[in-house]
Curated annotation (Swiss-Prot):
Name of the featured protein: Isopentenyl-diphosphate delta-isomerase
Main localization category: cytoplasm
Function: Involved in the biosynthesis of isoprenoids. Catalyzes the 1,3-allylic rearrangement of the homoallylic substrate isopentenyl (IPP) to its allylic isomer, dimethylallyl diphosphate (DMAPP).
Binding site for Mg(2+): 161
CDD domains assigned to the protein according to its UniProt record, in alphabetical order: IDI-2_FMN
Keywords: Cytoplasm, Flavoprotein, FMN, Isomerase, Isoprene biosynthesis, Magnesium, Metal-binding, NADP
Species for this entry: Borreliella burgdorferi (strain ATCC 35210 / DSM 4680 / CIP 102532 / B31)
Amino acid sequence: MGIEPNILENKKRHIEICLNKNDVKGGCNFLKFIKLKHNALSDFNFSEINIKEEIFGYNISMPVFISSMTGGSKEGNDFNKSLVRIANYLKIPIGLGSFKLLFKYPEYIRDFTLKRYAHNIPLFANVGAVQIVEFGISKIAEMIKRLEVDAIIVHLNAGQELMKVDGDRNFKGIRESIAKLSDFLSVPLIVKETGFGISPKDVKELFSLGASYVDLAGSGGTNWILVEGMKSNNLNIASCFSDWGIPSVFTLLSIDDSLKANIFASGGYETGMDIAKGIALGARLIGVAAVVLRAFYDSGEDAVFGLFSDYEHILKMSMFLSGSKSLLEFRNNKYFLSSYLLDELGVFKQFYGT
């Protein structure tokens, strides 16, 4: 039995819509209001700079990962397979698209079982928090085991679902399900938003529920309410939420430093300088997604390799010019904030009680 045509068409449309950045970018990521400190007396060899990280039992080449995007359609599966191979060569982690459809179409599991292409890197499976409630802890855990991944991402995407005509409406029980799943798993649990951010209070709660890592996935990147609004030709509603959400910058600047080793940041990180700023703010890893999708569909695998080569050089340059040999040094007060961001941050902290 093949996958229903409407499901395949929806996934294909997601890719098509996300290729046009200007149509689906939501809000401001506030990264432009952060400046990295300049040190004119960096007294060491550029080759001494080390941007490698050890995480999930692997040594990765830089503190960047490819965030989950799509899967299920032929286009999405081919895209994922290519990206996993690229990520393995580059030695960076990668997340796969949601495996929700495998509960209805288990015969397609090989399209999601890509560890055979990812021997050198952490590979993440991905499913919605609502699906844990829907299918139960044991089925989710068994699927994760079959997919042979190094960690599981549980995504929170209420905004997207509420905008979909046939999306989920009942989110009751997701907290309890996340907590129970964390107890049941033999791999780390990553909980992420999908472009609307996570408040400092919710970050603490997710860790208390058993999350190993939290990906802030803030506003300022792809806005999935706009994506669904475009897909259903209903921008009258979707456009009202064009600037909805919390930029990851605000949460990074508001949480305790002790939590940051387990914090990933994504949502509008597109350039090497964006990545450098996110790392300087303390994020363990920075996630990139749509910018990779666009590079791949514009110019193929070579463009993706070029993108990550630029990321590596810009991050190393930023570290050298701020007098940092290591990521640890780079995360040690190597930035300053504009007066505008300081004012906005003050309002944010007051509003969210941090």
